[in-house]
Amino acid sequence: MVPWLGPDDPFPSIERALGPATGAPGLLAASADLLPSRLIDAYLRGIFPWYSDGQPVLWWSPDPRMILVPAEFKVSPSLRKTLKRVLRAPEWEVRVDHDFAGVMRACAQAPRRGQRGTWITAEIIDAYTSLYRSGNAHSIETWHDGRRVGGLYGVSFGRMFFGESMYADVTDASKIALAALIAHLREQRLEMIDCQQNTSHLASLGGREIARKAFVAHVRSAVAEPPIPWQFDKRVLAALTSPAETAAPTGTER
């Protein structure tokens, strides 16, 4: 039985999350609220919300957990070529936190293979925008000729980044944003990005699964560290244009 959380109820132990033999592995709890304080507490514990319109707020802590280590990020030859073109052409920009809510809305509207509707509800946008205003959520955006054409957003505490979603209106725009994020996190020596769930797209970029226990232990340590800076631009991409970076073809995105 999944516990129902009242406004003042704490999260249960993550070990109580539903197991792989259930229809919802990783489901930990449900609630009616998505208050910023609840959301912050969730991330600090390695828990995240994921639900659809008409459902209660569902809280998850899957085992294993999909992560991406910035040092293990793989760049395909075609993406490397794209990054070089972006670096050369002044009409391409990478902006940070320029239009956070706009990136979230674009992610909500992006079609996803095998999905109907979106889990990025108006309530989710309001809650994460509150985190953005407090400096704990960020958007990495790809711009071309003065128009935002792709990007991603996520949550950051200390030296931990929790990826949420990405979108692209033009080919490779989301990958450019992700590459810029990876390059920046490498510079900051950040060790792990939370990717929540396993997808072929993430795996092709170097993502892998680790045990929930190891993930939560890392989160507890990383979020206690001082926060990293969040000012950078497309020049960070130069670090990813070496032929040493390789990857398999990519699949779908979350």
Curated annotation (Swiss-Prot):
Keywords: Acyltransferase, Cytoplasm, Transferase
Gene3D superfamilies: Leucyl/phenylalanyl-tRNA-protein transferase, C-terminal domain (3.40.630.70), Leucyl/phenylalanyl-tRNA-protein transferase, N-terminal domain (3.30.70.3550)
GO biological process: protein catabolic process
Top-level taxonomic group: Bacteria
Known catalytic reactions: N-terminal L-lysyl-[protein] + L-leucyl-tRNA(Leu) = N-terminal L-leucyl-L-lysyl-[protein] + tRNA(Leu) + H(+); N-terminal L-arginyl-[protein] + L-leucyl-tRNA(Leu) = N-terminal L-leucyl-L-arginyl-[protein] + tRNA(Leu) + H(+); L-phenylalanyl-tRNA(Phe) + an N-terminal L-alpha-aminoacyl-[protein] = an N-terminal L-phenylalanyl-L-alpha-aminoacyl-[protein] + tRNA(Phe)
Function per UniProt: Functions in the N-end rule pathway of protein degradation where it conjugates Leu, Phe and, less efficiently, Met from aminoacyl-tRNAs to the N-termini of proteins containing an N-terminal arginine or lysine.
Pfam families, alphabetized: Leu_Phe_trans (PF03588)
Stated name of the protein: Leucyl/phenylalanyl-tRNA--protein transferase
Family affiliation: Belongs to the L/F-transferase family.
Single GO MF descriptor: leucyl-tRNA--protein transferase activity
Group of enzyme by EC: transferase
